[in-house]
């Protein structure tokens, strides 16, 4: 096989299931088909990690389809740090054999390009500032925002293309390079019954409390409310956030991406359950984060 250098700008490898903090979005047949062998191995190892290292109830431990968080978005909602441990374990044989070198906290800075060939990419150690130049027969970009595309002056397209560009019947008349999906910074939130963890009002509280996205078709009210447009129809949908899981006809955001269901664990293991917040309410719509990432503080604001 090949010798590979894997760079990662944070201290966690992974992506969606790790530093992005998002449980995997999976199809409903995932337990029986529609997955590669390596992905199925990854899923099995996630469950085994909880069985080996966590104080599960007997029912949870014996459940072949253990879902640590019992979240609705995936049949295997779990903590991002568990994914990091499992992914590192899966890569360890290649690291041990000298076939894979992992450079954490390294971010691409510049490139050496001749014609259409990328000869080298220089990365910077974010901890000590040291520059390392990597040479290879080819480079694969798996960054969040396609960092290597502008650095290597590779042709690329952002936003939406026009009917003239693609000949698609339902494409827009005009292309819009800034028409990208909203950017979201996810975070975990724990609910402990009887406790109050209200903080002081943060900066820009009043602005965000009253902010209505300026979109066409119109957003159905304030962003920070429990009403949001249904993605498939854009009709207003009214949700709730009920941490104890009380049955309701409304969509319960708390259950959507819950990564720890305390009832899967022995009593007193957790004081409460934990959910991952990746909801319409924390979408950032005031700038094109892809284009602004290197030139503005908008990423920090988002």
Regions found by a protein language model. Name each.
Residues 121-125:
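Short beta-strand segments that buttress and anchor functional surface loops
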Residues 9-106, 110, 181-187:
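Conserved N-terminal/central alpha/beta ligand/cofactor-binding core
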Residues 294-302:
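Single conserved hydrophobic/aromatic residue that forms the stacking wall/gate
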Residues 141-197:
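Glycine-rich loop(s) and the adjacent beta-strand/alpha-helix scaffold that form part
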Residues 129-138:
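Core beta-strand elements of the Rossmann-like FAD/NAD(P) dinucleotide-binding domain
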């Amino acid at each position: 096989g090949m010798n590979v250098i894997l760079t990662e700008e944070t201290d966690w490898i992974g992506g969606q299931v790790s530093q992005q903090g998002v449980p995997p979005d999976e199809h409903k047949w995932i337990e029986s088909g529609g997955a590669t062998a390596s992905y199925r191995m990854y899923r099995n190892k996630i469950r085994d990690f909880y069985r080996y290292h966590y104080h599960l109830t007997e029912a949870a431990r014996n459940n072949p389809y253990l879902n640590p968080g019992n979240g609705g978005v995936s049949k295997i909602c779990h903590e991002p740090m568990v994914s990091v441990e499992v992914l590192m374990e899966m890569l360890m044989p290649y690291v041990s054999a000298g076939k894979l070198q992992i450079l954490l906290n390294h971010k691409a800075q510049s490139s050496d390009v001749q014609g259409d060939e990328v000869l080298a990419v220089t990365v910077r150690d974010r901890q000590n500032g040291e520059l390392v130049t990597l040479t290879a027969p080819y480079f694969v970009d798996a960054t969040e925002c396609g960092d290597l595309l502008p650095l290597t002056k590779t042709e690329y397209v952002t936003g939406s293309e026009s009917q003239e560009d693609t000949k698609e019947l339902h494409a827009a008349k005009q292309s819009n390079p800034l028409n990208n999906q909203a950017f979201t910074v996810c975070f975990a939130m724990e609910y402990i019954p009887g406790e109050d963890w209200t903080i002081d009002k943060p900066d820009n509280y009043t602005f965000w409390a009253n902010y209505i996205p300026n979109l066409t078709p119109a957003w159905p009210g304030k962003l920070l409310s429990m009403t949001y447009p249904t993605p498939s129809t854009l009709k207003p949908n009214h949700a709730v956030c009920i941490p104890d899981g009380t049955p309701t006809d409304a969509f319960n955001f708390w259950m959507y991406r819950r990564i720890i269901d305390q009832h899967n664990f022995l009593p007193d293991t957790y004081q409460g359950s934990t959910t991952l917040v990746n909801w319409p309410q924390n979408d950032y719509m005031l700038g094109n984060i892809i284009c602004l990432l290197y030139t503005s503080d908008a990423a920090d604001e988002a």
